[in-house]
Amino acid sequence: MEKEKDKKPLFGGIFQKFFKPSAKAEAKKKKEHHLTVQRSIPYLEMGRDGICRVEEHLYSKTVRFYDINYQLAQNEDKNTIFESWCDFLNYFDSSIRFQLSFINHKSDMSEYNKVIQIEPQHDQFDDVRMEYAQMLKQQLAKGNNGLVRTKYITFSIEAKSVKEAKPRLERIETDILNNFKVLGVKAYPLNGVERLQIMYEMFHQEEERKFEFSYDRILQSGMTTKDFIAPTSFLFKSGKDFQMGDTIGAVSYLNILAPELTDKVLAEFLDMDKNLVVSIHVQSVDQLKAIKLIKGKITDLDRMKIEEQKKAVRSGYDMEIIPSDLATYGGEAKKILDDLQSRNERMFLITVLFLNAAKTKQELDSAVFQTAGIAQKFNCTLNRLDYMQEQGLMSSLPLANNLVPIKRALTTTSTAIFVPFTTQELFMEGDSLYYGLNAVSNNMIMADRKQLKNPNGLILGTPGSGKSFSAKREMTNVFFTTTDDIIIADPEGEYYPLVEALGGQVIHVSSTSRDYINPMDINLNYADDDNPLGMKSDFILSLCELIMGARDGMEPEEKSVIDRCLPLVYQKYLNDPKPENMPILGDLYDCLREQKERQAQRIATALEIYVNGSLRVFNHQTNVELDNRLICFDIKELGKQLKKLGMLIVQDQVWNRVTINRNAKKNTRYYIDEFHLLLKEEQTAAYSVEIWKRFRKWGGIPTGITQNIKDLLASREIENIFENSDFIYMLNQASGDRQILAKQLNISPFQLSYVTNSNEGEGLLFYGNTIIPFKDKFDTSLKLYGLMTTKPNEIAKYREKKDA
């Protein structure tokens, strides 16, 4: 059962059509016999700037607009969008005709394939590389059979010349773009070439030949713009369909019979997986004329009511017994009059046309039948334009010139029920990566985090929801399609199979390991200015603070002592930056021992176990390959005493790498699994906050992977991590976390259903200001799946297979 708020009443009956002449009479009214295909196309000139002279004194422009999330929005947000759309419609006065065009057409899949294309590199990774490439192609094929959905608004005005029309059209265009901006809708005006391409694609729906045109060719060849877009032929022999080139088509109009419609009606039509053009022609009626018309109808109804009452009296019946239609129409007319006079409503004349096209008559009839079925679902009918197929086809072109004389009178609210927004898509070019399929449209999601204001990201989900798997899939995609470096902090030892398979370096950090990383490592690009030691000092202070277990931080005297020692410790390296001159923790310890202050001795004593004692794993020169493109710091075996220290040192190593890569103009991706472990300690949490603040400027892209959003809201400082993340990949969420996310990201209850008891690999993607539900069912038979899975039984099977 439809919710009351999702439906808007329509007025019908005697107001349904202003006129509909006889079809055959209309066919005979053609003023001239078109001898060529070009003369059938109803415009005179198309300018480079997108201004089209449609008729002698009629000029038009077109704006393309994109989708926003309407169907998945909260009811409150839906109402806001609907009211803004009503205001949008009310902007148009009676001097402006406008046409909304919604075009579903088969796309050139080669353009999409270019975005997901992964070329073989003829190296040892080609087997998994091409396996991943094939998976992407299969996922692309699942999305809407290669259909592209585009949306346009075309507006036209009458003017004596293009000189007079141009400034007015540009002013209207600016207002339309601003009105779209209020709605949060991206839009841009089309130039002449883009407008011609739309018409070319409408005339050649079943052809693969691309549109080739330039205005320079017109000057060279003496041809007209119509020569470049026209099909080989038009045949309007039948009254119910037509032939254009190798395509057969039919145009129908929507006969609105329902007393009320839902805001889902247009979305249902646009969800069809067939070629379809929906055109809604709208003409505003002058307000005074509209009120005068309604008052005239009310007068006519009152006169008819009086006549019926007289008949009733003469026949001996109660004069209150009159035909029910009269009472209905009378009440309806008075309500419309009230809306026009006091509720900011206008009256519009609208024509809704549907252009179906196919290769064969059978396919066409099937498409028309499917379209008619959707209309019937909403208590409307889809009627063929008998003997007006040519007018219907030409009215479907985005020229804002309606040649079909069948119109329906609707108020603003009733017109706005054809909400042109459904759900957003995300398919970007550039270094875009695969994030699953849109759960609503089934279209592929390809997004480039580098294009976000803040590319920082979070992957959130309950255990078993697919967090680590999603992170590994992104890493794999990054490895195959970019030159970015990838660094992983792995507290659970889950990533090494994938890292080793991709030729990466796994660094096992533990008290018994022979892999060493030096916390004193520094490079000359460590800071923005020429003083790398200044920023390194912050890290050393955090390190010592953690070692000393100072809950309230170190005393100022202790910080001063360390700050005094650091230039002495690094002097040899800064004078001669050779690897063998890099200091180690023991050098800092020795320097502190030489200081006279008791604070220095206290710090040195705290450092002693990490320099000469059982925890001296971090008192060595780095002996592992840190210039590998893919590095995983496996800290699973670090004991409780070293775990926090190890995670802080790993973060500093990442910062070292980021600073080196910045000079090389290279991005660095940093993945932190079990991110909540870092947020529990003040020092590592503070360092993480700094990473989220500073990384973007240095070309770093950090991603935190954790279970609970609550950990990210533990303090105002840590909350900055959440606020500075424009990419959030949400898998299944616990109840408490769902409510927090809904509040923080303005997620609707319907959207929340995608992270409520959802299957593995399903959830919501927050990208900038866009929220898209996704699903990602990864083929378990692929070799890559065995490298990426975290399920113990599947890992065991993979190892057995590998050892066999």
For each of these PLM feature ranges, what is it?
Residues 68, 75-94, 101, 105, ...:
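P-loop NTPase motor domains
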Residues 470:
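Hydrophobic positions on the alpha1 helix immediately C-terminal to the Walker A/P-loop
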Residues 467:
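Conserved lysine of the Walker
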Residues 745-801:
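Conserved P-loop NTPase
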Residues 477-487:
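Post-Walker A helix-loop "phosphate-sensing" segment adjacent to the P-loop in P-loop NTPases
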Residues 459:
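Hydrophobic anchor at the beta1->P-loop junction of P-loop NTPases
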Residues 2-421:
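Extended, folded cores of ATP/NTP-driven motor/assembly subunits in large transport
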